[in-house]
C-alpha cells in the first residue's frame, strides 16, 4: 500500500469517527496536513468519488438509519450530523432518497411494521 493510500485510509477512518461534526474540507485537509486541493485529488484517485460527496453520503446514511431506528426529531438528527440547517438537510436528504426525512420515516416504518 502506498503512503498516499495509507493517508486516505487514515482520513476515512478519522472522518467516520467525526461524522457528528461539520467536517469542512478545509478542516479535513488541515487534519491530514495537506492542502485541500491535493487531498481532494488524492481522495478522488483512491476512492473514486469526491471527498465532499463521501462525507455527505456517510452522514445521510447515518441520518436515514437514525430516522428509522430512533424517535429523534428530524431537527435533532440534522444537528447531530452537523448540517447547517434543517432546510439544507431536508433538501439534500430528499435529493438522495427521493423523499423528505419525515415521509421517509413514515414510508419505511410502514414497510417494516
Swiss-Prot record:
Disruption phenotype: Deletion reduces transcription of various genes, including acrB, porins ompC and ompX, and some pathogenicity island genes including invF, sipC, sopB and ssrA, in the SL1344 strain. Reduces growth in the presence of various phenothiazines, including amitriptyline, chlorpromazine, sanguinarine, and thioridazine. Intolerance of hexane. No significant effect on adherence of mutant SL1344 strain to mouse-derived macrophages. Residues 9-107 form the HTH araC/xylS-type domain. GO terms for cellular component: cytosol. Residues 26-47, 74-97 bind DNA. Induction: Chlorpromazine activates expression. Indole activates expression. GO terms for molecular function: bacterial-type RNA polymerase holo enzyme binding; DNA-binding transcription factor activity; sequence-specific DNA binding. Keywords: DNA-binding, Repressor, Transcription, Transcription regulation, Virulence. InterPro entries: Homeodomain-like_sf, HTH_AraC, HTH_AraC-typ_CS, MarA-like, Tscrpt_reg_AraC-type_HTH. GO terms for biological process: regulation of DNA-templated transcription. PROSITE patterns: HTH_ARAC_FAMILY_1, HTH_ARAC_FAMILY_2. Overexpression of ramA in the SL1344 strain confers multidrug resistance and also tolerance of both hexane and cyclohexane. Transcriptional regulator. Binds to regulatory regions of target genes, including efflux pump operon acrAB and outer membrane protein gene tolC. Represses transcription of genes belonging to the flagellar regulon, including flhD, flhB and fliC; probably thereby leading to repression of motility. Represses expression of the flhDC operon in a post-transcriptional manner. Activates expression of acrAB, perhaps thereby conferring multidrug resistance. Involved in indole- and bile-mediated regulation of acrAB; binding of bile to RamA may contribute to activation of expression of acrAB. NCBIfam families: ramA_TF. This is Transcriptional regulator RamA. It comes from Salmonella typhimurium (strain LT2 / SGSC1412 / ATCC 700720).
Amino acid at each position: 500500500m502506498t503512503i498516499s493510500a495509507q493517508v486516505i485510509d487514515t482520513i476515512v477512518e478519522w472522518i467516520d469517527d467525526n461524522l457528528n461534526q461539520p467536517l469542512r474540507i478545509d478542516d479535513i485537509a488541515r487534519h491530514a496536513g495537506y492542502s485541500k486541493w491535493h487531498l481532494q485529488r488524492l481522495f478522488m484517485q483512491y476512492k473514486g468519488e469526491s471527498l465532499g460527496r463521501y462525507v455527505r453520503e456517510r452522514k445521510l446514511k447515518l441520518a436515514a438509519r437514525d430516522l428509522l431506528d430512533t424517535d429523534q426529531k428530524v431537527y435533532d438528527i440534522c444537528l447531530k450530523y452537523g448540517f447547517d440547517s434543517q432546510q439544507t438537510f431536508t433538501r439534500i436528504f430528499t435529493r438522495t432518497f427521493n423523499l423528505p426525512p419525515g415521509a421517509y420515516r413514515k414510508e419505511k416504518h410502514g414497510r417494516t411494521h
